[in-house]
Design a protein with these regions (language model features):
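Terminus-proximal functional modules
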Residues: 20-222
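Bacterial Sec-dependent signal peptides at the C-terminal "C-region" and cleavage site
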Residues: 13-21
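Sec-dependent N-terminal signal peptides
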Residues: 4-14
């Protein structure tokens, strides 16, 4: 079974999820990535687009992005099979841009949002065959997720903004099963993740905080 290191960094030494200073980082061993870097913009600052382009020129690809108490937090890695990557960073949801990129063979590989901007990352040569996107309150999302799970789609990106959850589900052979969890405390979500790892769910996908609850998706992988 894949070994993992779960690193929890709480800047105000608080275990309460409602504390906006909590930053949770998941580090995983034995992946296909052989080099990784990360950087953050600083609270209230714009995305460091120049930095992204510099690392693109060194064959790094964005593999994770989140908006945190430290501003935009970007991780980029080598060793991914993707061949091209693009992103949209703007105040409105980039529907037309996503449509055009899909026609060119791109799929959404990372997604996040701040109060003022969306950040959508799309890549070519992914393991996704098709994608569905839904933006709705969580009460609606639950049924929508079940519907697409039944059609062999899996959650691959998720973000929450102003009470609305945006979920991307992808048709892929990478996963065999998937679940998600909520907790109001850091310790609570740590315990739930460990239980799922013991059950064979060996990859945690995405953390998101909304209404003082921490969300995490986890799946079994091939």
């Amino acid at each position: 079974m894949m070994r993992k290191i779960l690193i929890f960094i709480c800047f105000l030494l608080s275990s309460n999820i409602s504390d906006a200073q909590n930053l949770i980082i998941l580090a995983q061993q034995e992946t296909k990535m052989y080099n990784q870097t990360w950087f953050y913009s600083g609270s209230g600052n714009s995305l460091q687009e120049t930095k992204i382009k510099e690392y693109w020129n060194e064959d790094f690809y964005i593999n994770s992005i989140a908006y945190t108490s430290k501003g935009w937090f970007v991780t980029m890695a080598k060793g991914l099979k993707w061949t091209n990557q693009s992103y949209s960073y703007k105040s409105s949801w980039p529907d037309e841009w996503i449509h055009e990129k899909k026609k060119a063979g791109y799929m959404i590989t990372s997604l996040s949002s701040s109060n003022s901007n969306w950040m959508v990352v799309m890549s070519q040569n992914t393991d996704y065959n098709a994608q569905e996107i839904c933006s709705a309150p969580w009460a609606t999302q639950r049924e929508w997720i079940k519907k697409w799970w039944n059609n062999d789609y899996y959650i691959t990106s998720v973000t929450c903004r102003n009470g609305m959850w945006t979920v991307v589900m992808s048709k892929t052979s990478l996963y065999t099963d998937q679940t998600y969890m909520f907790s109001s405390t850091v310790d609570g979500i740590k315990e739930k993740i460990k239980i799922k790892w013991d059950e064979g769910y060996n990859s945690s996908l995405k953390f998101e905080i909304m209404a003082k609850q921490l969300y995490v998706a986890s799946q079994r992988v091939l």
